[in-house]
Each structure stands twice: as structure tokens, then as C-alpha cells.
């Protein structure tokens, strides 16, 4: 040790040296027992030998050796602590990855819930407006529900329909006298009843022809056939009764494709039939066509 010497006489050689509690070194000749010769303070003395304690020997060792020894210990301590730190960092990294995934899922759910919330708010606003309108005018919507169209029953063409009496022209009675000779006639220029009615309106109206007095020849057999697809009434035959009374006629109507015969009065027939028949008869009469047994038929 190059630095070791007596602090009083500065000797380096010698066998016996002492160290005081105040940190001074003295040789055997310079040492004093009461107080330190350098600083003058009361102190204790310790003789230097190989039997010193480790905590006392460390002051006389090389600093490099002490540093290396401590550095080795420090390195072991640092390596142990670094391993623990690495494990903790790996745990936190794994946890951060999980939290980031959960955060992304939560953000996506939040966006979808925001969209759904906006849609629900819009729908709620519309329903509130509609409810306010209903509270202001409830009778308006009840009236609209009451005028809802309902299904209408349609009579099957196979069923027989009895003509209703015409109260409009029931007071007017057309008298027809019996005749020995039947004057049937057939419409020549009209294909159907609807077309014949339109063709006759150009010459005379049904009201004018209805007001005319029929001739005695009108009591003979008149046959009126309607289209089964349009009216479903079948065949109406106007025939004089055997006893000469022209107030009744025999009407043939089909019922389930089987004809049945019923008796009704001329006044009970629909009011639109007599003017048309009279008009056609008057035209036939003015045209001067010969009479025969052919039945006049027309289809609606």
C-alpha cells in the first residue's frame, strides 16, 4: 500500500502501527494515549494486524478489488431484478393487448348503438307526432275506418231472379186485345239489346215509345231472350192466356239449368222491357214486314 504512513513522522517502514478513532495513523513512537497528536481530540487506538474484523479490513484493501467485488454483487442483484422486471413488462404487454381488443370491440358496439339510438329517436318522434294527431282528431280516423269498403254478395247466374215490380210505371196499364193471328217479329238490325237500345235512341226515345198505345196485335206470342252470361234470367215468353186475358203472361226462367214456368203480371215486369218491345214493334209495323210464327229474340 503506497499510501500507508505515520501521520506524525511520516515513516512507512516499521512493524507496529496504530489507527485512531478519529482516522489518523501513528507509529509506535508517535502514538499518544490521551488524545490525537494531529487533531488533539480524545480518541481510541487500534493496533493494526492480520486479526482485524472484515468491516475493519475493508479500509485497507484496494478500491479496485472492493469495486469489483461490489460490482459482481451489484451485477447479480441487477440481473435478478431485471428478470423480474421483464416478466412484469410481458404481463403488462399481454394485458394491454387484451384491453386494446376489448376497447375496439366496445367502440364498434358504441357506434352501432349510436346509430340504433338515432333511428329509435327518429321513430319515437314520428310516433309522438302521430299520437298527437290522433289525440287532436280521433273522430276523423274513426270515420275513415267506418267507410272501409265491405265485400258485396254477387248472385250466381244459375239462380233464378224474379223481376221486381216497377212502381214508377205501375199506374200505366197497357191493354192488349186477343187476336186469332199471332204476329211474331224479329229484330233485323241489332245484335244485342244494348246495341238495339243505342240504335233506337237516334229515332225515338223509350219514353216516347212507352207513351204510345200498343196495337191489338201485341197480345200475340212475343219471345224475349236474354244472354245467360250477362243477366242470368233465361227466356221471357209473352203469351196470351187461353181465356183471353192479356193481363197475365207466362215467364220461363232457368233454375240450375232446368226451366220452370211461373205466372206473373205485365205490370210486375221491369219497366225497361215494355218501351223497348213497343218501339221494336212500331218499327216492325212501319217497315211493313210480313208476320209469321218466328219468335223475336235479342241478347243483352
Curated annotation (Swiss-Prot):
It comes from Homo sapiens. Autoubiquitinated. Residues 155-165, 211-232 have a biased composition (Polar residues). Residues 87-124 form a coiled coil. Pathway: Protein modification; protein ubiquitination. Homodimer. Residues 141-232 are annotated as: Disordered. A zinc finger (RING-type) spans 6-40. PANTHER family: RING FINGER PROTEIN 212B (PTHR22663:SF29), RING FINGER PROTEIN NARYA-RELATED (PTHR22663). Ubiquitin E3 ligase that acts as a crucial factor for crossing-over (CO) formation during meiosis. Essential for normal prophase I progression and for ensuring appropriate CO designation in meiosis. Recruits key components of the cross-over machinery either directly ou indirectly, leading to the activation of the MutL-gamma complex. The function of RNF212B in CO designation is dependent on its catalytic activity. GO terms for molecular function: SUMO transferase activity; ubiquitin protein ligase activity; zinc ion binding. One of its GO terms (biological process) is chiasma assembly. InterPro entries: Zip3/RNF212-like, Znf_RING_CS. Residues 191-200 have a biased composition (Gly residues). This is E3 ubiquitin-protein ligase RNF212B. CDD domains: RING-HC_RNF212B. It catalyses: S-ubiquitinyl-[E2 ubiquitin-conjugating enzyme]-L-cysteine + [acceptor protein]-L-lysine = [E2 ubiquitin-conjugating enzyme]-L-cysteine + N(6)-ubiquitinyl-[acceptor protein]-L-lysine. It comes from the Eukaryota. It is an enzyme of class 2 (transferase). GO terms for cellular component: synaptonemal complex. Residues 166-182 have a biased composition (Low complexity). Its EC number is 2.3.2.27. It is found in: Chromosome. Keywords: Chromosome, Coiled coil, Meiosis, Metal-binding, Transferase, Ubl conjugation, Zinc, Zinc-finger.
Amino acid at each position: 500500500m503506497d499510501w500507508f504512513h505515520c501521520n506524525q513522522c511520516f515513516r512507512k517502514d516499521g512493524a507496529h502501527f496504530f489507527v485512531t478513532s478519529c482516522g489518523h495513523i501513528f507509529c509506535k513512537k508517535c502514538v499518544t494515549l490521551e488524545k490525537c497528536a494531529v487533531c488533539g481530540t480524545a480518541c481510541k487506538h487500534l493496533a493494526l494486524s492480520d486479526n482485524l474484523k472484515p468491516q475493519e479490513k475493508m479500509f485497507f484493501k484496494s478500491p479496485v478489488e472492493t469495486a469489483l467485488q461490489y460490482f459482481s454483487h451489484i451485477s447479480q442483484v441487477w440481473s435478478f431484478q431485471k428478470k423480474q422486471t421483464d416478466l412484469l413488462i410481458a404481463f403488462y404487454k399481454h394485458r394491454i393487448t387484451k384491453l386494446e381488443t376489448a376497447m375496439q370491440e366496445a367502440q364498434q358496439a358504441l357506434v352501432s348503438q349510436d346509430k340504433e339510438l338515432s333511428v329509435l329517436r327518429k321513430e319515437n318522434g314520428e310516433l309522438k307526432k302521430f299520437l298527437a294527431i290522433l289525440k287532436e282528431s280521433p273522430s276523423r280516423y274513426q270515420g275513415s275506418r267506418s267507410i272501409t269498403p265491405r265485400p258485396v254478395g254477387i248472385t250466381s247466374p244459375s239462380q233464378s231472379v224474379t223481376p221486381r215490380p216497377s212502381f214508377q210505371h205501375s199506374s200505366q196499364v197497357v191493354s192488349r186485345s186477343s187476336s186469332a193471328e199471332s204476329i211474331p217479329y224479329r229484330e233485323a238490325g241489332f245484335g244485342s239489346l244494348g246495341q238495339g237500345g243505342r240504335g233506337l235512341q237516334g229515332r225515338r226515345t223509350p219514353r216516347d215509345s212507352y207513351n204510345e198505345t200498343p196495337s191489338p196485335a201485341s197480345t200475340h206470342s212475343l219471345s224475349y231472350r236474354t244472354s245467360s252470361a250477362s243477366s242470368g234470367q233465361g227466356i221471357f215468353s209473352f203469351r196470351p192466356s187461353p181465356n183471353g186475358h192479356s193481363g197475365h203472361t207466362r215467364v220461363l226462367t232457368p233454375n240450375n239449368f232446368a226451366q220452370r214456368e211461373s205466372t206473373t203480371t205485365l205490370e210486375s215486369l221491369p219497366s225497361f222491357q215494355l218501351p223497348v218491345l213497343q218501339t221494336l214493334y212500331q218499327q216492325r209495323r212501319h217497315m211493313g214486314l210480313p208476320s209469321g210464327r218466328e219468335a223475336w229474340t235479342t241478347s243483352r
